[in-house]
């Protein structure tokens, strides 16, 4: 079946195409062209002068739609994925927080099942923890933190092909060996919830850590100890060109000035947007059942300490917020699609509107609200 999207402004790696068309054949893009003449046998979709852009790639989300991926059930996965799909995340890497070995194994089984399904937006699993510094880990991780255990992490990795990213604190004993092992398996080793100083960050990068989770959050910046000043993890990451970063652009975790600064210094090629959302993304939640979490000021906080523990944002909200912060739309779209696809190793299929890639496509109005969306050529209902 052919579908031809016409009468829109198409965003491609080469720039914008006016008065062109995107042609979908089944689950893939047949062509992106500067011609909008109707194709014989194709169903025409009129974009009404709106933006036609790549589907967003969500590489860090703990849940949505009222469910948490760490529940590790098929029902929870499907509910959370459906919520993010409606907000433009046509590719998703579900995040499982620190949990028991058996629970993670159950989550792996669910992830493998969904990845095998035709049309699934799931491209792999993201594990955050348990190898995190307790001094920087938020309340949501509870008592499930540990130092890297080669027997445990090798058993998990060798049991599946679905683990695509794993977060850890590089200053922990055994963390550098952990990163080197992940790198050898093609898994993105990520710095997270850390107190690492410059030399530790440099050593981490050389060992295999290439990405930083929720940049600025869960890590120290420039600080003073007695009369002397020291760099933190943040400045160390800025100094190492090869490290990529992610920003929670929900309007709560980081101010506009920092969103602009980080994306300017690291560059579009090294910066991506993530929700780091908890179960309450995509739902109108005011009160929550979790005894440890409250929603206040549009963000998830620890009920006891009021520390930020996650967002309620979706990918479309991040894009809108970045543009409001003054970042050019073209850069923002790349940070929501192209860059995360490249970081996660799926740019051959995802992240841009190009021939033979998956037909993951969004139509946005001038306020960057999603008006129509396709995931692998299938129109997403309920938008």
Feature annotation, model-predicted:
Residues 15-24:
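A conserved glycine-rich beta-strand in the N-terminal activation segment of trypsin-fold
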Residues 50-52, 59, 69-121, 143-159, ...:
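Alpha-helical scaffold segments that flank or form the walls of functional sites
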Residues 62, 78-107, 120-133, 160-171, ...:
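Divalent metal-dependent hydrolysis catalytic cores, especially in the metallo-beta-lactamase
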Residues 82-93, 133-160, 203-244, 284-309:
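Active-site gating loops and adjacent loop-to-helix segments of metal-dependent hydrolytic enzymes
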Residues 127, 182, 212, 322, ...:
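Conserved, mostly hydrophobic/aromatic
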Residues 158-283:
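Active-site core of metal-dependent hydrolases
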Residues 229-247, 263-275, 280-364:
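His/Asp/Glu-enriched, well-ordered alpha-helical/loop segment
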């Amino acid at each position: 079946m052919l579908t031809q999207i016409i009468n829109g402004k198409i965003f491609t790696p080469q720039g914008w195409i006016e008065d062109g068309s995107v042609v979908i054949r089944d689950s893939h893009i047949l062509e992106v062209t500067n011609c909008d003449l109707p194709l014989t046998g194709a169903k025409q979709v009129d974009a009404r002068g709106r933006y036609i852009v790549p589907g967003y790639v969500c590489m860090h989300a703990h849940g949505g739609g009222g469910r948490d991926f760490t529940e590790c059930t098929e029902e929870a996965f499907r509910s959370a994925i459906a919520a993010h799909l409606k907000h433009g995340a046509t590719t998703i890497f579900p995040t499982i927080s620190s949990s028991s070995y058996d629970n993670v194994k159950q989550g792996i089984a669910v992830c493998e099942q969904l990845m095998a399904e035709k049309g699934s937006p799931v491209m792999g699993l993201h594990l955050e923890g348990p190898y995190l510094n307790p001094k920087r880990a938020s309340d949501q991780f509870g008592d499930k933190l540990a130092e890297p255990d080669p027997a445990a992490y090798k058993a998990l990795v060798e049991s599946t092909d679905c683990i695509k990213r794993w977060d850890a604190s590089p200053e922990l004993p055994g963390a550098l060996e952990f990163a080197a092992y992940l790198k050898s398996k093609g898994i993105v080793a990520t710095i997270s919830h850390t107190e690492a100083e410059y030399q530790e960050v440099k050593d981490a990068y050389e060992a295999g850590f290439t990405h930083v989770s929720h940049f600025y959050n869960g890590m120290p910046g420039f600080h003073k100890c007695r009369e002397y000043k020291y760099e933190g993890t943040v400045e160390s990451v800025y100094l190492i060109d090869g490290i990529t970063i992610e920003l929670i652009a929900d309007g709560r975790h980081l101010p506009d000035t920092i969103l602009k600064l980080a994306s300017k210094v690291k560059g579009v090629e090294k910066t991506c947007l993530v929700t780091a959302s908890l179960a309450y993304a995509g739902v109108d939640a005011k009160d929550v059942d979790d005894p440890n979490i409250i929603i206040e000021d549009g963000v998830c906080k620890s009920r006891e300490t009021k520390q930020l523990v996650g967002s309620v944002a979706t990918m479309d909200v991040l894009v809108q917020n970045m543009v409001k912060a003054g970042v050019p739309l073209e850069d923002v779209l790349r940070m929501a699609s192209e860059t995360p696809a490249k970081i996660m190793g799926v740019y051959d299929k995802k992240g841009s509107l190009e021939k033979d890639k998956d037909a993951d496509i969004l139509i946005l109005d001038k306020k960057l609200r999603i008006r129509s969306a396709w995931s692998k050529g299938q129109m997403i209902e309920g938008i």
